Every structure is written in structure tokens, then in C-alpha cells.
């Protein structure tokens, strides 16, 4: 009796496994979950290190991120039919030399965390994500196009008034070689939050790209800062 029960259990397990495999194969054409990441550690030797009174010291160290910050993330895409799909992204950045999050003890665990919809009408995303002025600069005229997210030198962040923003709604659409995007982020009356209104236009064709962007940033204190960027490559 025990043998028969064992055989029945095995058969049921095999059927469940087969049906699970069939479901996975059927769903791969309409949805995907992708785990991605990069780990970057660099050795740095610096001379003339130290205060002005004694700057002849040398320093040897490991740094978490030479070309790019170490990071891992999850991308999700789900086909909703009618040419529309749902999107999800979560991304964490960390120092590979120590394993600690780059955001520190008080910063956000995920540097990106957003959901969205994409279809023939464009792409709409909501959450913590890249500032679209940063999108424009890094995709159009980055200082180092082979690695625009380079960890050592990032003038693009200054151009864009920061790489990311919280509580953001972002819309992007393309018509031929022209891409346009709009962004609005809520301050939510937070003492540390800020409100942004941003837009850009970008043209790219035949190996050439040019873009114009504008951002209005309002601090929690009420002070406002404006940024314009224009460039091409």
C-alpha cells in the first residue's frame, strides 16, 4: 500500500511539474522578469594626499565603483494586450568594497522604484526614477558616452540638478527621430522634499543627436532654481 501511494504521489508531482513548465512557456511570450546587475571594484593609488600642511602622503584604497556604481535590479514587463504593456523597475546601488548601500543609513534603499504603462501613445511611469534632464544629457551629449554613469566624474548630475527625483510622474513619447518628455514630482509637503517641473525635446538621426531641456526646481523652503541645457553630439 505504501508503494502504491508513493507511485501516485510521484505521478501527481510529475503532472504538476509538466503543467508548470507549460504555463511558463506560454507566459514567456507575453511577460518577462529580468534580474540584472553589475559589480565594480577599483584600486586607487593617490599621492599628495592629506591636508595642505602635509599633503605629501600617499593613499592606497579599494573603492566601490571605478567606472560605474555597483548595482542590481529587477525589470518586469507584462503584456496587457492591445499593444500596451505594464512595466516595473526596482534598482539598488551599493559599494562592492564594503557591501553597504550607496544611499547610506538614511537614504532610500532603492535608487529606482517605479511602475508604468507603455504603448502606442508613449510611456507613462510613476515613482522614484531618473530626472528627465539627466535622461537627456546622458543620451545626447554625455561627457563620457561609453559610460555616462561613470562613478568618478559625473558633470551630468550637475547639469540635471540631480540624477533622480522622488514622487515623480514621467511621460515620454517618440515620433520618428523626435522624442519629447515631461516630468512632474510632488513635494508632498515634506521638509526635505522638492517639487520639479521638467521638459525636453531631443532629435536623433544619422548618428547625430541634439536636445534642449528645462527644469524648474522648488525647494521645501519655497526657493526656486531653474536650469536650461542645450547640446548635441
For the regions a protein language model found, what residue spans apply to each?
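Short glycine/serine/proline-enriched coil/turn segments at secondary-structure junctions
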Residues: 82, 189-191, 220-222
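Cleavable N-terminal export/targeting peptides
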Residues: 1-28
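Outer membrane beta-barrel
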Residues: 26-46, 58-185, 193, 202-206
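Detector for outer-membrane/organellar transmembrane beta-barrel domains
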Residues: 197-233
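Short strand-loop junctions, especially beta-strand C-caps/beta-turns
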Residues: 183-187, 215-217
